[in-house]
């Protein structure tokens, strides 16, 4: 029977299919195929998209021969009445039954498949409402199709998707869950069977970031954190250890004031740590499980680079336009920099809100900034309120409902402070440039402050976020 194709469904049609039609479609969420086997069983699950009511958009291929051709595709725009509808189905190849699971809670919700138990009896998914301020982590009984909510999360104005983490431990018996519910990104451990919170693993006025490794036998997790240690730049990746069975039992493992990139051995006994700053060359060490350095490894020989005139950029700190919030940035100078001269300044920008283009680690040429400085400019990139979840919820969500203007005043005020601090900056010759969201921001900046910015370069700017 394995060699004979068997059709299990008959209701497919264009834009309502189990196997996405990638041609002419925007990048999807589930890949080219949305059907997957459930481990250890004769069942499969499928995520089906219904795009039949989603608006059509069009492209004209003017290079097509012998004449231009029209391409029609489906695309959701902000505020559209009709958007993609998602379905979860479980099929049985023995009974040839395909069952639609009742996953709906909110109109126009979006779903992610998270985990399937090793015995194939339980499937977990996460659903979000359309405003993206509520979500459920749900368990599906594969046999019966019954859905149970394990964790409900609600956070306004919106949930942080960029740094979200949902990890299933001990074959799904526990769930490690990251939340900004107290205003700061922290980790919580739940009992999956009951949905009860077992422990809040991290807490405080700082941000717990990406998890690098989880030791389920030793009952520890290893993760990067930001802003916990006084005197350390809040953008630097600092490695910590937390106990799974004790609340807020957090231990610092990499104390140096630098950004760390750590690889932990399979035994959890050792870790290789490469740490640096924009002006400090990488230091590569081996640490034991307590964070103690037990060996220093090789380091790069950059003397030829310095002999060619290369100069490391400098990190700086200024205030936001509110006069209270600290902002961090990086400054590049020409190789032949002369402090007695005056230089025009260019701000390389990206508004976020999931990422700030403010490097923290050592690099010889950070995109175009080093090269641009050699043309006789002071080049900076500086963070701003609304730019990243690494600084906490209030900082991250500052730009909500103000997509165009929220970063502009901070960029302008940062440049004004630097010009007042450094006589070599000419505040009458200010340029701004960026790509994508940065292109959007640079165009908005010169239109909003035409007497401050002298020139703007906008690359592929998304100037109307309604489309």
Model regions and ranges:
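Beta-propeller fold detector
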Residues: 3-13, 99-102, 147-152, 198-203, ...
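Predominantly five- to eight-bladed beta-propeller fold
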Residues: 5-36, 45-100, 290-305, 357-368
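Internal hydrophobic scaffold segments of catalytic domains
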Residues: 1-5, 31-55, 139-141, 275-277, ...
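Structural motif
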Residues: 54-59, 85-87, 132-139, 183-188, ...
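Short glycine/serine/proline-enriched coil/turn segments at secondary-structure junctions
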Residues: 130-132, 157-159, 230-233, 278, ...
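Serine-hydrolase catalytic core recognition
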Residues: 56, 126, 261-467
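Conserved beta-propeller blade repeats
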Residues: 14-44, 72-80, 84-87, 104-128, ...
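Short loop/turn segments that connect beta-strands within beta-propeller blades
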Residues: 2-3, 92-96, 142-145, 192-195, ...
């Amino acid at each position: 029977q394995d060699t004979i194709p068997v059709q299990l469904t008959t209701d497919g049609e264009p834009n309502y299919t189990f196997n996405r039609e990638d041609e002419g479609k925007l990048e999807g969420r589930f890949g080219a195929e949305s059907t997957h086997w459930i481990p250890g069983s004769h069942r499969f699950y499928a995520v089906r998209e219904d795009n039949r009511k989603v608006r059509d958009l069009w492209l004209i291929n003017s290079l097509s021969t012998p004449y231009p051709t029209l391409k029609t595709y489906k695309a959701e725009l902000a505020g559209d009445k009709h958007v993609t509808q998602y379905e979860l189905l479980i099929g049985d190849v023995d009974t040839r039954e395909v069952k639609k699971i009742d996953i709906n809670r909110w109109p126009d919700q979006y779903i992610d498949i998270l985990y399937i138990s090793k015995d194939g009896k339980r499937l977990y998914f996460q659903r979000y409402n359309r405003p993206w301020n509520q979500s459920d982590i749900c368990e599906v009984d594969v046999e019966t199709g019954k859905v149970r909510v394990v964790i409900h999360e609600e956070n306004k104005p919106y949930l942080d998707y960029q740094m979200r983490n949902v990890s299933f431990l001990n074959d799904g018996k526990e769930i490690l869950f990251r939340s900004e519910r107290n205003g700061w990104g922290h980790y919580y451990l739940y009992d999956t069977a009951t949905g009860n919170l077992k422990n809040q693993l991290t807490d405080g006025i700082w941000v717990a970031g990406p998890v690098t490794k989880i030791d389920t036998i030793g009952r520890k997790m290893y993760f990067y954190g930001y802003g916990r240690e006084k005197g350390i730049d809040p953008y630097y990746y600092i490695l910590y250890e937390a106990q799974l069975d004790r609340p807020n039992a957090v231990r610092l493992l990499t104390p140096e004031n630098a950004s760390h990139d750590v690889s932990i051995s399979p035994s959890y006994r050792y870790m290789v740590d490469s740490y640096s700053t924009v002006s400090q060359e990488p230091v590569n060490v081996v640490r034991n499980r307590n964070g103690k350095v037990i060996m220093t490894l090789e380091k790069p020989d950059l003397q030829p680079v310095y002999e060619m005139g290369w100069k490391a950029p400098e990190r700086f700190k200024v205030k936001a336009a509110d006069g209270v919030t600290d902002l961090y940035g990086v400054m590049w100078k020409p190789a032949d920099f002369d402090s007695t001269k005056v230089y025009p300044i260019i701000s390389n920008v990206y508004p976020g809100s999931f990422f700030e283009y403010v490097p923290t680690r050592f690099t010889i040429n950070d995109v175009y900034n080093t090269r641009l400085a050699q043309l006789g400019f002071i080049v900076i990139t500086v963070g701003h309120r609304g730019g990243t979840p690494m600084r906490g919820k209030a900082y991250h969500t500052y730009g909500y409902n103000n997509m165009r203007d929220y970063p502009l005043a901070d960029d302008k005020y940062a440049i004004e402070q630097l010009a007042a601090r450094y006589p070599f900056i000419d505040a009458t010759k200010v340029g701004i440039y960026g790509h994508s969201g940065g292109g959007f921001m640079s165009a908005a900046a010169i239109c909003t402050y035409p007497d401050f910015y002298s020139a703007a370069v906008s690359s592929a700017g998304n100037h109307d976020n309604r489309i």
